[in-house]
């Protein structure tokens, strides 16, 4: 019993008798408010604990030889789809000219609304032309390429075949009205119909994981003496408006929290024949999710430069939108991790202890202030 008596001397929380405890309305109010605040702070701390934190690390990138996927969604409000070509090339010498297999073009009217097939038929009906039916021709025919025949292309049964044969020869496609295939397909008329339209280009490119560029430019592209050129003879340089809106551009898949700096970028060309260049630095990124899933993608930074691509008015060059990218030799690894449970417990204890302490101080202040005021009131009554 003597030992228990000595132990009681270390009690930091001495108790008072129930008869000496005073309960007040002010104390009840402070208790309820502090309890609600404590609950809100606890829920906030719990929500923070349930989220994951991301730890970044930096490594040398050794993953060469892979393919790089470029996701594209760009609108050109004043450049018809029939005039626009998309090309990609890299420092290894690989070229993709007038890419079509994974990229799609959608015609837009002057208000930016997609042109439906019903609208196309309506436009054709307005000028009362006979729609060309390719099934009406002999499937075994072999038509002329107008001197552009090669070992790969011996027959040109459509206007596009003739254009491709000309492109491979490095010839300019000057006057389609002199070519029977283009005349019967109404090539010139289609070009005229789309003159005031815009174009949306969307899809993806797969390129080698080396430095390179891809661009959107008017005219049919081809190689001539190992030089990449575009046939602009059917355009007036004063009519090329490269105003564009980059809805989305990314290199690889998106991961939580990624920021693509070119998304929703709207650029208005101040004059005709503008050349816009985007210099992009691609940083390979590995994102490891907390469940073990590994996502290999890329981040990038960008700088824009623009100039007039008209030899008479400015520097030499080609009107269009060019994205020139190079890859960083470093790789960023982002790892998701659960937050520390001990940190959560520490936070909860701090919330509870802090609220109890502050609530006790406020309650004591209210109680003693009320007693002091009541004493003065009672003293005034007696006098």
Curated annotation (Swiss-Prot):
Residues 1-25, 363-383 are cytoplasmic. Residues 1-25 are annotated as: Required for MARCHF2-mediated degradation. The keyword Acetylation applies. One of its GO terms (biological process) is endoplasmic reticulum to Golgi vesicle-mediated transport. The modification Phosphoserine is found at residue 116. InterPro entries: Erv, Erv_C, Erv_N. Pfam families: COPIIcoated_ERV, ERGIC_N. Keywords: Acetylation, Endoplasmic reticulum, ER-Golgi transport, Glycoprotein, Golgi apparatus, Membrane, Phosphoprotein, Transmembrane, Transmembrane helix, Transport. Forms homodimers. May form a heteromeric complex composed of ERGIC1, ERGIC2 and ERGIC3. Within the complex, the interaction with ERGIC1 is direct. Interacts with ERGIC1/ERGIC32. Interacts with ERGIC2, the interaction is required for the stable expression of both proteins. Interacts with MARCHF2. Interacts with SERPINA1/alpha1-antitrypsin and HP/haptoglobin. Possible role in transport between endoplasmic reticulum and Golgi. Positively regulates trafficking of the secretory proteins alpha1-antitrypsin/SERPINA1 and HP/haptoglobin. This is Endoplasmic reticulum-Golgi intermediate compartment protein 3.
